[in-house]
């Protein structure tokens, strides 16, 4: 409990620093949201532009803008998005669900299948099965997700017509109940596959290496000498210890998936945080972008905390202090 | 005595309505269905009286109607039924359609027009605030007659030409007494159009449904329209092919896909319906650079550009060579009697030698820093072609890649460029569009304006005179002169005139049947599914 509290207090300055750093970094980019807006509109006169800038508070010096923003953030007020003409908090909550759903399905798919394949390959090192799995891993690893997305789209949507091209649900389909769940699931098949395959190959390769390493250690030999069956050996002695580096990677990658989903979300037009972040940069939508970064830093801090807890659970030698 | 322009237009419009009706009969209209339209970019707001932008009209045009629209037969009455001007051009009287209701059931009256004109068109709407700068007041002599009073003469044909884009009344009862820019109806518009706004899911879609109470009886045919936001052009092409999307306008798919789908008999691919939305691909000069300030150099550079080649390879043939600031779609204001610059690289080299810029030891005459606008694929390709063509005549061009805000600031505010390229849309009348490229005196930071350091008192005078000339014939002549002068002096090269391109499923019927179709109301669009 005290441990959790300490971690929480430590997280505050980290997040504040991230926010200030990002704010200043974004201000270094040429142009602001009014420029982007005017670019979208195909032009405007000088008065229109000056009025909008005053309206958005962009005519103030940067440090005044930063101070105002941090004050508002302290009360968890994310401000107003001038691109979406909605409060940032509303937009973020709208988008968070889709992203978390996509992340959860992709990572759990990648993780379970990845460690299973990795363990199988490791147990049969240099056999035909190992070669097949390793090659597959290499192919997944080398295929860029945008290419994979488009190829899947071409095959399953355009040629075969099995799966929808994009979106999160059938618009004007007005499905409810289980039909709705099924509809969303159908829309998530390709994005999940596109996003998870590369991570699957990470876990696969790491798990394979880790299992091979652990399988040679003394305590495994001891367990085998004591008469533990192969299955028990694998689950209790090898897997549990081999998982540690994989968990580390999982924790690290949780944040990467947020970024990696930009491409997949854009191609499949999933209304998630990745797509929103990308749009916000292009549109110089400071408030939304800062909101996303705040949310992401919180997610990363929480995930790191959970990873540490999981470590202690898997390896009782690790103490939380 | 009042100038009457409308009677011919009315006759034409009614004939058109009859012909259209008979065509429709012949094809046996199917009612109902949902048309799905591809949009590349998210819209910030959907209020066309606050944002003059085709992206906004593409959606709001079905929900909010303008006073006057444009058809292939001329200007078509929508919420206005008749318009006329006083002799001195200081008062324009507009008769309004009776028996029209807003989507919330309130009647549409002159109060709405007067409120919107003063509070939005004059104060807040881009392009319009310049056009309506001399608008003093709008009087409602009765609930269906609006009189626009100007302090300077306003040519009636300019007023009418501006209305399809810049003449959308909004409901006064929902805006009065509120902060107009933050009004919730800006993203959930209430209009008088054939479709009613239902919802806008950010990043996904906008949904509108049939207005059962629409004033054109028996219309619309469709039950629903869905606009889907698909940022990725390849994914949009896949959606078209999979039949999930029926139309993608404004070159919403890659040029390679435009070419590929034009051979696919499931789609109509072409530039019909964009006559009012033509744009110029440009080469813009920074005249602060002494080399580029020399008109001979600019003319030589024009001779170095193979425009026909660029049209074939980049625009896939869907374009024509530019002839100055007024495009061929500009009607009477256009002329092709202007100086032109044939592709002749040898001549270009000779001219550059003569201008005093021989090839130096570096292998080039001089070096230019070029900023390409990030407005889509073909703009980038045009920049690359330009750089290549210039190298052939001995000018080294370095391309500085930037995103939209970077480009706009680099060129139009900081003037940190030698040459730039982008495109600029023509909006029915030169006075409300392309003249800003030539008129000097606009403060730094005004995008799409003369920020090139080019200044000509003669040109400024010609532009101002033409904007307030009441006689349409004289006005057209003035624009011919401006066009010729712009082609001679080349402050900007209006290199390629191109409409936009649509890919449309053949299941859609009556599509692209007006010169600004993507912005129009689609009341007669139907789906053969």
Question: Model segments located where?
Answer:
Chain B
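Extracellular/periplasmic solute-recognition and catalytic clefts
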Residues: 120, 137-140, 198-209, 226-289, ...
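Aromatic- and charge-enriched surface segment that lines or borders ligand/interaction sites
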Residues: 81-126, 141, 147-149, 236-239, ...
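Structural transition elements
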Residues: 195, 321-355, 374-382
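N-terminal lobe/hinge region of extracytoplasmic solute-binding protein
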Residues: 38-87, 118, 190-192
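Surface-exposed binding/hinge segments that line
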Residues: 95, 129-175, 199
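Gly/Pro-rich hinge or "lid" segments in bacterial periplasmic/extracellular proteins
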Residues: 73, 164-220, 224, 346, ...
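Detector for C-terminal structural segments
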Residues: 43, 201-205, 210, 278-281, ...
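A bilobed periplasmic-binding-protein/Venus flytrap-type ligand-binding module shared by bacterial periplasmic
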Residues: 70-71, 209-213, 275-300, 304, ...
């Amino acid at each position: 409990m005290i441990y959790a509290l300490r971690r929480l207090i430590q997280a505050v300055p980290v997040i504040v620093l991230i926010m200030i750093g990002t704010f200043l970094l974004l201000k270094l980019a040429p142009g602001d949201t009014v420029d982007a807006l005017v670019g979208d509109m195909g032009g405007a006169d000088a008065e229109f532009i000056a009025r909008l800038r005053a309206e958005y508070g962009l005519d103030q010096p940067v440090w005044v803008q930063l101070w105002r923003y941090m004050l508002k953030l302290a009360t968890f007020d994310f401000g107003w998005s001038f691109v979406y003409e909605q409060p940032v908090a509303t937009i973020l909550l709208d988008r968070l669900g889709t992203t978390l759903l996509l992340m959860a399905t992709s990572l759990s798919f990648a993780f379970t299948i990845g460690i299973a394949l990795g363990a199988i390959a490791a147990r049969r090192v240099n056999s035909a099965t190992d070669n097949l799995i390793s090659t597959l891993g290499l192919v997944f690893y080398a295929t860029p997700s945008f290419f994979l997305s488009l190829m899947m789209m071409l095959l399953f949507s355009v040629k075969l017509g099995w799966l929808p091209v994009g979106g999160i649900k059938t618009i004007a389909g007005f499905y409810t109940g289980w039909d709705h769940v099924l509809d969303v699931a159908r829309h998530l098949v390709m994005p999940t596959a596109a996003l998870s395959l590369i991570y699957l190959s990470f876990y696969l390769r790491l798990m394979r290496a880790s299992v091979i390493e652990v399988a040679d250690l003394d305590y495994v030999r001891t367990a085998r000498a004591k008469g533990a069956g192969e299955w028990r050996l694998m689950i209790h002695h090898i897997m549990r210890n081999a998982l540690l580096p994989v968990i580390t990677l999982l924790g690290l990658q949780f944040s990467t998936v947020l970024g990696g989903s930009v491409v997949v979300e854009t191609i499949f037009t999933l209304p998630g945080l990745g797509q929103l972040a990308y749009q916000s940069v292009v549109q110089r939508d400071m408030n939304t972008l800062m909101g996303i970064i705040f949310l992401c830093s919180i997610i990363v801090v929480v995930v790191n905390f959970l990873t540490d807890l999981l470590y202690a659970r898997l390896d009782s030698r690790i103490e939380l202090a | 005595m009042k100038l009457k322009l409308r009677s011919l237009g009315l006759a034409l419009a009614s004939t058109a309505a009859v012909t259209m009706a008979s065509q429709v009969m012949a094809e046996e209209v199917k009612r109902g269905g949902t048309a799905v339209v591809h949009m590349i970019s998210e819209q910030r707001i959907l209020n066309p009286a606050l944002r003059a932008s085709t992206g906004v009209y593409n959606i709001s045009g079905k929900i909010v109607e303008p006073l006057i629209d444009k058809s292939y037969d001329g200007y078509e009455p929508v919420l206005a039924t008749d318009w006329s001007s006083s002799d001195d051009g200081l008062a324009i009287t507009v008769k309004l359609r009776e028996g029209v209701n807003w989507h919330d059931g309130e009647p549409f009256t002159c109060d709405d027009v007067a409120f919107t004109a003063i509070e939005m068109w004059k104060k807040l709407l881009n392009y319009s605030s310049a056009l309506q700068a001399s608008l003093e007041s709008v009087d409602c002599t009765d609930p269906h007659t609006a009189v626009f009073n100007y302090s300077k003469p306003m040519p009636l044909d300019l007023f009418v030409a501006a209305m399809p884009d810049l003449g959308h009344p909004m409901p006064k009862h929902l805006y009065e007494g509120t902060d107009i820019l933050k009004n919730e109806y800006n993203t959930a518009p209430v209009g008088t159009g054939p479709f009613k706004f239902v919802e806008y899911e950010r990043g996904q879609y906008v949904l509108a449904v049939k207005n059962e109470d629409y004033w054109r009886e028996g219309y619309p045919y469709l039950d629903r329209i869905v606009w889907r936001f698909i940022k990725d052009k390849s994914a949009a092409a896949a959606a078209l092919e999979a039949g999930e999307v029926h139309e993608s306008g404004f070159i919403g798919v890659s040029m390679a896909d435009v070419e590929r789908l034009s051979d696919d008999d499931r789609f109509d691919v072409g530039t019909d319906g964009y006559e009012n939305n033509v744009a110029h691909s440009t080469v813009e000069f920074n005249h602060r650079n002494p080399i580029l300030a020399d008109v001979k150099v600019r003319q030589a550079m024009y001779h170095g550009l193979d425009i026909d080649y660029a049209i074939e390879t980049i625009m896939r043939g869907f374009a024509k060579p530019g002839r100055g600031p007024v495009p061929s779609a500009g009607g009477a204001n256009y002329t092709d009697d202007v100086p032109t610059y044939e592709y002749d690289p040898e001549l270009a080299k000779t001219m550059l030698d003569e201008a005093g810029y021989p090839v130096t030891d570096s292998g080039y005459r001089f070096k230019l820093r070029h900023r390409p606008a990030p407005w889509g694929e073909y703009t980038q390709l045009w920049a690359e072609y330009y750089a290549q063509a210039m190298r052939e005549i001995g000018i080294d061009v370095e391309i500085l890649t930037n995103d939209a805000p970077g480009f706009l600031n680099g060129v139009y505010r900081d003037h940190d460029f030698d040459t730039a390229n982008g495109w600029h849309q023509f909006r029915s009348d030169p006075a409300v569009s392309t003249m800003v490229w030539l008129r000097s005196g606009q403060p730094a930071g005004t995008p799409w304006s003369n920020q090139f350091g080019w200044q000509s008192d003669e040109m400024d005078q010609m532009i101002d005179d033409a904007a307030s000339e009441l006689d349409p014939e004289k006005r057209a002549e003035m624009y011919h002169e401006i066009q010729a002068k712009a082609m001679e002096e080349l402050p900007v090269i209006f290199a390629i005139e191109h409409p936009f391109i649509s890919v449309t499923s053949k299941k859609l019927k009556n599509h692209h049947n007006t010169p600004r179709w993507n912005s129009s109301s689609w009341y007669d669009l139907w789906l053969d599914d």
